[in-house]
């Protein structure tokens, strides 16, 4: 996976000091950002030129104390040909030697008004997301009450129809049929649609539906974190289903664990309403209210009361 410098410019606002068409096509292959403090002092033993080079106040201040050809010689080493882009934060002045070094190595040179730590965070977050390894899962990804919900189940069970009904009830579609899943950080899983299927739902017997055209921009979302999974399965009276909600299932995607609720489907059940209830119950548990525990406490109190009687 790689991100071009042009992709970075399309996403984050910078003032371009120097660029060329070839420099804009250079690839960023890591989300780690280099702040070349020791390098400006001449120590290059662990220098990693393939990273973005970010100059903050400290690096810039030291650079400005170096004068004459020494400054240019240092900058030529820091701004190596392998370096994809050099960024100067805080709208700090760009010395002519830095522009000359950028031209020498054909590197895009950018300036940002953002504080260095803030810019570092924005860059890392963007690159982590874009460079993350993606896997494809079959299902419907929705934003329901602000919760990212991945709806899965056997083919033909009604996942897309449930998603369409949820859109009609005011929730937002992220992806239908193919969901591209990626790990945004160590504990967060996110999902987005395949570009060709963005804003689309396929309903058997009807065909492809453009959700944004029919229901408006508020009915779709580009991506969402996956907070819970719901699995639709055909009702089987011989199979035991969780009736109290005290036996949660955990599924794993890309090494991230996600709580799963399994919902039996049969004629006459309003699946979209049940999905909404499952999501609201999930939110309530996150807020500290557990209806199952409340019921168990009441049952324990009732049994104790009957024994005393």
Curated annotation (Swiss-Prot):
Record: active site: 138, 159, 177 (proton acceptor), 243
Chain positions recorded as Mg(2+) binding sites: 160, 202
Which EC class does it fall in? Answer: transferase
Q: Give yes or no: UniProt keyword Acetylation.
A: no
GO terms under biological process: regulation of carbohydrate metabolic process
Q: Which cofactor does it need?
A: Mg(2+)
The protein's Enzyme Commission number? 2.7.11.-, 2.7.4.-
**Which parts of the sequence are annotated with region: Important for the catalytic mechanism of dephosphorylation?**
264-269
Start and end residues of each stretch annotated as Important for the catalytic mechanism of both phosphorylation and dephosphorylation: 201-210
For the ligand (ATP), the binding residues are 153-160
Q: Name one GO molecular function term.
A: magnesium ion binding
Q: Give the comment on domains.
A: The Walker A ATP-binding motif also binds Pi and PPi.
In terms of HAMAP family, this protein maps to: HPr_kinase
Role according to the record:
Catalyzes the ATP- as well as the pyrophosphate-dependent phosphorylation of a specific serine residue in HPr, a phosphocarrier protein of the phosphoenolpyruvate-dependent sugar phosphotransferase system (PTS). HprK/P also catalyzes the pyrophosphate-producing, inorganic phosphate-dependent dephosphorylation (phosphorolysis) of seryl-phosphorylated HPr (P-Ser-HPr).
Q: Which family does it belong to?
A: Belongs to the HPrK/P family.
As a miscellaneous remark, the entry gives: Both phosphorylation and phosphorolysis are carried out by the same active site and suggest a common mechanism for both reactions.
User: Which proteins does it associate with, and in what oligomeric form?
Assistant: Homohexamer.
| This protein's name | HPr kinase/phosphorylase
């Amino acid at each position: 996976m790689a991100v071009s410098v042009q992709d970075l410019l399309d996403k984050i606002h910078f003032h371009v000091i120097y660029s060329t068409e070839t420099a804009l096509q250079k690839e960023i292959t890591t989300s780690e950002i280099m702040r070349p403090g020791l390098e400006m002092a001449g120590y290059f033993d662990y220098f990693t030129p393939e990273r973005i080079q970010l100059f903050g106040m400290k690096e810039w201040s030291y650079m400005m104390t170096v004068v004459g050809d020494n400054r240019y010689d240092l900058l030529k080493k820091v701004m190596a040909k392998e370096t994809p882009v050099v960024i100067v934060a805080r709208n700090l002045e760009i010395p002519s030697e830095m522009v000359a070094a950028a031209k020498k190595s054909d590197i895009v040179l950018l300036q940002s008004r953002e504080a260095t730590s803030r810019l570092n965070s924005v860059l890392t977050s963007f690159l982590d997301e874009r460079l993350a390894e993606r896997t494809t899962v079959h299902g419907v990804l929705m934003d329901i009450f602000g919760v990212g919900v991945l709806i899965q189940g056997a083919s033909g069970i009604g996942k897309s129809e449930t998603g369409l009904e949820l859109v009609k009830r005011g929730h937002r579609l992220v992806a239908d049929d193919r969901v591209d899943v990626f790990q945004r950080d160590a504990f967060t899983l996110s999902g987005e649609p395949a570009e060709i299927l963005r804003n689309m739902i396929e309903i058997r017997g009807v065909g492809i539906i453009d959700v944004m055209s029919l229901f408006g921009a508020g009915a779709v979302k580009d991506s969402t974190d996956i907070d819970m999974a719901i699995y639709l399965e055909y009702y089987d009276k011989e199979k035991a289903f969780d009736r109290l909600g005290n036996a949660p299932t955990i599924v794993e995607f890309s090494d991230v664990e996600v709580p799963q609720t399994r919902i039996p489907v049969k004629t006459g059940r309003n699946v979209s309403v049940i999905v909404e209830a499952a999501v609201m119950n999930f939110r309530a548990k996150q807020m500290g209210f557990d209806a199952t525990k409340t019921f168990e406490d009441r049952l324990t109190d009732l049994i104790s009361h009957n024994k005393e009687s």
